[in-house]
Amino acid sequence: MSGIFLLHQTKMKKIAIQGIKGSFHDIATHQYFKGEDIELICCDTFEKVFDEMRHEGSLFALVAIENTIAGSLLHNYELLLESGLTVVGEHKLQIEHSIMCLPEDDWDTLSEVNSHPVALMQCYRFLKNHPGLRVVEDDDTAGAAEHISSRHLKGHAAICHKDAAPLYGLKVLEEGIQDNKHNFTRFLVLTDPWNADLVRDARLCNKCSLVFSLPDDEGCLSQVLSIFSFYKINLTKIQSLPIIGREWEYLFYIDVTYDDYVRFHQSLDAIKPLTRELKNLGEYVAKK
């Protein structure tokens, strides 16, 4: 079931993602919007995703925000805050890597493997066991598969999701080559604030992303966390980023879950006097 509660099921939705068909963003988007009529707007970079959102307010975006191995995508936090977009959902995708090549190639004809640097890092042990393969970084996992296919690069292999193979006419040599089998990426679903209430039911929301800064006073952060604890608000993530141009000052991005919507908003009222620049980035349904 989709994590988004749509009131207009028949209208096709346009979703901006970083990457191309067969990328992990593509796979996560189709899982999240399963059963819905969607059109992908594929962008080379995350900056271009947010540019698309600025130009057309009715769009959605699905953007990776953290990985259980690589950690947080810090720049995406900055892009989210600058954009003014609202978080209306999240999706967690298990990251599974496969190695694929042209149909006429095989292990004994391969000389080079291409993929995104993070994917290559996540397959370190596999690559170490194949020292004959020269490792070359690419901008995108599925993009590496597309390049091999479109340019008919014999002797080249791509590391990406297995779903990219049929899209680009490649054959899978081995699946599940990632070092850690418990590798997950969390994605946020974003849209313009005016569009948010059309696509979610606030009564069902139980998670919120917030950002704030704090004065340089002793114990400020612990006071904020104590207030959340008093109102039985569960902190699921905290991420600090330096504020550019303000030495040793930080923005705190936090995710919280709650059972009582009223008590959650009471907690926000209680922490507001303690914080600076408190902003609600969006309320949505927590995905397990």
Language model regions located:
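Domain-level signature for soluble enzymes in the chorismate/prephenate branch of the shikimate pathway
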Residues: M1-K288
